Each structure stands twice: as structure tokens, then as C-alpha cells.
């Protein structure tokens, strides 16, 4: 087969659909366009059985603002799927991804902009946010008879030639999962940012690296929040995703350690590119502003490339930045965002500890 490397994945799939190899591997396929200004969910008419594999290939851009042309996102930011009724939502970790249906039902697709209410795909945020979105995503779907990896390998062996097919097979053969004990926060989606690593002293740490991505991993804890409660950690930032203040909705790219409290709110301690230590602000993103507050604990690039220790009085920081502190800490978060200015980041975090004099909890 001649090379289709310059063709769209939809064109390649259309060319393959009548081949014996394609019919042997694929039960159904579809190409569709999702307009950015259409809230979720959109039915595809494709039926899946629980346990069936499917792959999603997407391209395109959703523009968030005419006044700010640099504000936009692609499939990794916006495209989600679910099997309805009853299935959990999933998102693309790359511009291609593959999934296993957790329920039997219809495959649905959705453009995400705002805040999920739950992991079934109900939106908590206002649908009005969609009215200003422009652009669209082009989506191709393959429903497999067997495994996604087996189907992709068979198509490639039969002569199918497209970078997206090869990339997705490689993606499946080399999965990147979050560090043990940590999971991605549903509202921010799955990613491939964080991995278990070691410091130069052979101590366990979490390394985060990427470009034009975002992700939050969380670890469940149960720790009292008293005037004596402190959170300590060490971190090293080698590349920061922002070079300007992060407290605007156009430049909100940052690295942070955070604590979530029993009331659902969270306080994130950030290493800012340029805001002064002690500065705190509500998240400038509307869907997050009532939930999340940022507190600058370190600033500037002078200490990039070296391990730096932090220790924060959680109760006092909450009282200063949010208000009356709740009674308990329920999760610790690691956060990185680089989707506003589309920059790169490289950092590591180690030795996260909660302690209050009476007890000590080693989180990492």
C-alpha cells in the first residue's frame, strides 16, 4: 500500500475499510466532526458490549476567545467519551487513545469545557461557557473485534500506513500509569505527566514533565487540621511552564502541591515564576474559583535545578487565604498546568509529609 502519511486518518480508514484485514479486525467505524460550541453529549449510534475495545483518533482545535487567539485546546484538552447509559467518562491522554467499554451501550462523545459534577459526565458548570467556543474536532472511531493493540498491529502488518495508527500501538505497548497510590483527578482528566522516579540520593520522588498539558494526581489521606498541622515537602523545578504572573485566566500555568479539605475546597502552594511569596488568590478560572485558592511559597528562577525544602503551617495558610479552616485534610494533590501558554515543564517532588507534633503521615 502506498504511503498515507500526508493523508488524514479518516482518509486512510476509508481506503482500508474494504480490505480483508480491516474487516477481520474492525466491527464498526465512524468519522464525525464535533463543534466546539456544542455541550456534551453527542450520540454516535455505535453500540458496544462491556469489555469491547475501541480506539479514538482526533485532530483540530477549539478556540476559547477571539480576543486572545493563543487560548485554545486540542483533543487532549477537550475530547471525552463514555458508553451510555451508565458508563464512566474517559478522556484522551494523547491525540489518539484506546479504551475498554465498562458498560454495554452507545458510545457517546463530548467536548468538555468547565467542571464535571461526577464521573458519569454530568456538568456542574454553566453551559453558557460553550457559547463563546469556536472551531471543531475531527474524530475517527474504530470498534475492534479483539484487542485494540492486536487490531492495530494486524492493520499495520497488512500495510496500513499512518502515523496515528503506529503512534497508538506504541502508546498501548508502553503505557504510563500514575505512581502507586496516586490517581488522576476526574475533573482534570487522565494524562501521562507523572511517573515514579528517584532523587540523586536514591530517594523516591515523583517526576512530572510535558508540554501543553495539564494534570492533577491525588492521594487519599485522613489527617486532622489543627493550628499545629504542617505540610512539608522537597521539590526541584528545572523548567517552569510560565514566565509571567500566573494569577490571570490567560497565564494560569503553574506547578504546585495542594491539600484538599473535607469541605471540598483545596489550597495549592505554588512555585511562581514572578509573584511574591505570601501572595494568595482565588483560582482565576471561573469553574474553579469557588473551589481552589493558590498561595505563593516560592518565586523566580534563581533556585531552578536544585532541591528546595518547604514547610507550611496549613491551618494558618488556610485561615489567611480562604477563611475558617475545616477539620480534616482528605487528599494531597500534585498539580501542573501548561495549557494556557502552551509551554513546557520539568519538575520533581519528594518527601511530602503531614505532621502536627502528635502524629506524622508520610504521603510520599
Model feature map: region roles:
Residues 109, 119-126, 249-257, 291-300, ...:
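Extracellular beta-strand ligand-recognition surfaces/modules
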Residues 40, 205-227, 240-242, 292-296:
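Secreted extracellular polysaccharide-interacting domains
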Residues 59-61, 112-114, 234-240, 262, ...:
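Solvent-exposed strand-to-loop "edge" motifs in beta-rich extracellular domains
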Residues 80-81, 238-306, 345-348:
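Extracellular ligand-binding interfaces
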Residues 26-31, 84-85, 191-217:
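Short carbohydrate-recognition loop motifs
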Residues 1-169, 177-178, 250-252, 273-284:
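Acidic, Ser/Thr/Pro
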Amino acid at each position: 500500500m502506498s504511503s498515507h502519511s500526508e493523508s488524514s486518518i479518516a482518509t486512510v480508514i476509508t481506503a482500508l475499510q474494504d480490505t480483508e484485514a480491516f474487516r477481520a479486525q474492525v466491527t464498526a467505524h465512524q468519522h464525525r466532526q464535533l463543534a466546539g460550541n456544542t455541550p456534551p453529549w453527542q450520540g454516535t449510534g455505535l453500540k458496544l458490549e462491556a469489555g469491547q475495545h475501541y480506539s479514538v483518533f482526533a485532530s483540530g482545535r477549539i478556540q476559547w476567545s477571539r480576543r486572545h487567539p493563543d487560548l485554545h485546546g486540542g483533543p487532549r484538552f477537550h475530547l471525552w467519551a463514555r458508553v451510555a447509559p451508565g458508563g464512566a467518562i474517559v478522556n484522551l491522554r494523547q491525540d489518539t487513545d484506546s479504551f475498554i467499554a465498562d458498560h454495554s451501550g452507545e458510545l457517546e462523545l463530548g467536548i468538555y469545557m468547565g467542571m464535571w459534577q461526577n464521573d458519569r459526565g454530568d456538568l456542574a458548570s454553566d453551559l453558557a461557557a460553550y457559547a463563546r467556543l469556536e472551531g471543531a474536532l475531527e474524530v475517527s472511531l474504530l470498534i475492534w473485534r479483539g484487542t485494540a493493540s492486536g487490531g492495530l498491529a494486524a492493520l499495520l502488518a497488512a500495510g496500513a500506513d499512518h502515523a496515528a495508527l503506529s503512534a497508538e500501538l506504541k502508546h498501548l505497548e508502553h503505557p504510563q500509569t500514575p505512581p502507586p497510590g496516586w490517581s488522576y483527578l476526574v475533573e482534570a482528566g487522565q494524562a501521562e505527566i507523572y511517573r515514579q522516579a528517584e532523587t540523586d540520593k536514591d530517594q523516591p520522588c515523583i517526576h512530572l514533565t510535558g508540554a501543553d498539558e495539564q494534570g492533577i494526581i491525588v492521594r487519599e489521606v485522613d489527617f486532622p487540621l489543627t493550628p499545629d498541622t504542617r505540610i512539608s515537602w522537597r521539590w526541584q523545578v528545572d523548567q517552569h511552564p510560565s514566565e509571567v504572573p500566573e494569577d490571570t485566566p490567560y497565564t494560569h500555568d503553574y506547578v504546585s502541591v495542594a491539600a484538599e479539605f473535607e469541605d471540598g475546597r483545596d489550597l495549592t502552594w505554588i512555585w511562581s515564576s514572578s509573584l511574591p511569596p505570601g501572595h494568595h488568590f482565588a483560582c482565576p478560572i471561573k469553574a474553579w474559583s469557588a473551589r481552589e485558592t493558590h498561595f505563593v511559597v516560592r518565586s523566580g528562577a534563581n533556585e531552578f535545578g536544585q532541591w528546595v525544602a518547604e514547610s507550611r503551617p496549613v491551618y494558618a495558610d488556610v485561615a489567611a487565604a480562604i477563611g475558617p479552616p475545616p477539620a480534616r485534610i482528605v487528599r494531597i494533590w500534585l498539580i501542573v498546568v501548561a495549557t494556557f501558554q502552551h509551554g513546557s515543564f520539568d519538575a520533581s517532588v519528594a518527601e511530602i509529609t503531614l505532621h502536627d507534633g502528635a502524629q506524622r503521615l508520610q504521603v510520599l
